[in-house]
Amino acid sequence: MVEKRFQPLARDAMAYVLAGGRGSRLKELTDRRAKPAVYFGGKTRIIDFALSNALNSGIRRIGVATQYKAHSLIRHMQRGWNFFRPERNESFDILPASQRVSETQWYEGTADAVYQNIDIIEPYGPEYMVILAGDHIYKMDYEWMLQQHVDSGAEVTIGCLEVPRMEAVGFGVMHVDEKDQIIDFVEKPADPPGIPGNPDFALASMGIYVFHTKFLIECLKRDAADPNSSRDFGKDIIPYIVKNGKAVAHRFAQSCVRSDFEREAYWRDVGTIDAYWQANIDLTAVVPELDIYDKSWPIWTYAEISPPAKFVHDDENRRGSAVSSVVAGDCIISGASLSNSLLFTGVRANSYSKLEGAVVLPSVKVGRHAQLKNVVIDHGVNIPEGLVVGEDPQLDAKRFRRTESGICLITQTMIDKLDI
């Protein structure tokens, strides 16, 4: 007799990724693209992490709601995520805001972005819905969260981070009992409630929710009928369930995918220029906190066909070299020196230039003798010869987008305005 195989809950789930946000704190980086479409890690886009987590967890039905400046994001997903097959009971739906409910109504909130596509979700018949934010960097096996959701009998299970209590003021925070059932949900509290038994820490919402599909649809329809609702999961749906039903917290540490379990669970909201720069530069460490080399949990993406990176010239003061750096394919380091930098595809760094602490997006050209320190350079920028950034804070702030910590964002528009 053949033993019955265990059927993972993920096979009965649909992941729904909310990817319509701008990410305004990234300033000019999101002038032409939505935050989930922003480049990250030398090869991928931010959204690839949520999508890869779903795929690696065993989820084979995915929907992605888009809205703000979605062309770059949609094109990326069409190229890199087109391998789902209906004949294998797989689906990948890109769901731009398209006034499906009303001729005057776009997506009015995160909950509305799901509500307007109920007629697309229902025919697939998923037992569970995994609602995800498309703009965070982390690796997570959603199967563990699904299992806790079923075992606990919860109506919603919310992914949570354990963070120092006073750092939780910018999050939605869960007040839980000893069994992690949520007693109260507070949005950005001045005095966050601590965790039972660990009062110096609080449980902050990751914007990840698991529902039984039938229950979720009931909640969305009720919310849509409420004229006072803001149509948002964090502001409306979750507080209602916490007050009137059963909501449970799932601790991220229980499902975080990591190659070394002695290390802290890695999750980053790269929503500011400083955070974005730091998360990319972190990858240049000898052993980075985020393991992007783990073949058991790959980060899937659209990979261009490109030649390998090349380093040329070995003369005095003109040596193509890189130390503690990540360099993508099709880069040519022609007599330039790199340290603690991350370069995306197709970067050209010309002779005598020096990059230190640089995050360089695709197709950038760095002119001779340029000296660039602690910068983020947007896609396609041509850095003129001899440009110096990172030595004169006042001049940098006048020319570029400079943060309080000294990171400079450089775009082509800023370069075009230079009087050099």
Curated annotation (Swiss-Prot):
Which reaction does this chain catalyze?
alpha-D-glucose 1-phosphate + ATP + H(+) = ADP-alpha-D-glucose + diphosphate
Q: Give one Pfam hit by family name.
A: Hexapep_GlmU
Which range is the signal sequence, renumbered to this chain?
A: none
Any idea which UniProt keywords this protein has? ATP-binding, Carbohydrate metabolism, Glycogen biosynthesis, Glycogen metabolism, Nucleotide-binding, Nucleotidyltransferase, Transferase
Q: Name the InterPro entries on file.
A: ADP-Glc_PPase (IPR011831), ADP_Glu_pyroP_CS (IPR005836), GlgC_bac (IPR023049), GlmU/GlgC-like_hexapep (IPR056818), NTP_transferase_dom (IPR005835), Nucleotide-diphossugar_trans (IPR029044), Trimer_LpxA-like_sf (IPR011004)
Entry GO MF terms: ATP binding; glucose-1-phosphate adenylyltransferase activity
Q: Tell me the route in metabolism or biology where this protein functions.
A: Glycan biosynthesis; glycogen biosynthesis
What are the EC numbers? 2.7.7.27
Q: Which PROSITE patterns does this entry report, sorted A to Z?
A: ADP_GLC_PYROPHOSPH_1, ADP_GLC_PYROPHOSPH_2, ADP_GLC_PYROPHOSPH_3
Residues where alpha-D-glucose 1-phosphate binds: Y107, G172, E187, K188, S205
One of this protein's GO BP terms? glycogen biosynthetic process
Q: What does this protein do?
A: Involved in the biosynthesis of ADP-glucose, a building block required for the elongation reactions to produce glycogen. Catalyzes the reaction between ATP and alpha-D-glucose 1-phosphate (G1P) to produce pyrophosphate and ADP-Glc.
Subunit structure as annotated in this protein's UniProt entry: Homotetramer.
Q: Which family does it belong to?
A: Belongs to the bacterial/plant glucose-1-phosphate adenylyltransferase family.
Extract the NCBIfam families matched here.
glgC, PRK00725.1, PRK00844.1
HAMAP family associated with the record: GlgC
Protein name from the UniProt record: Glucose-1-phosphate adenylyltransferase
Higher taxonomy? Bacteria, Pseudomonadati, Pseudomonadota, Alphaproteobacteria, Hyphomicrobiales
* Gene that this polypeptide is encoded by: glgC
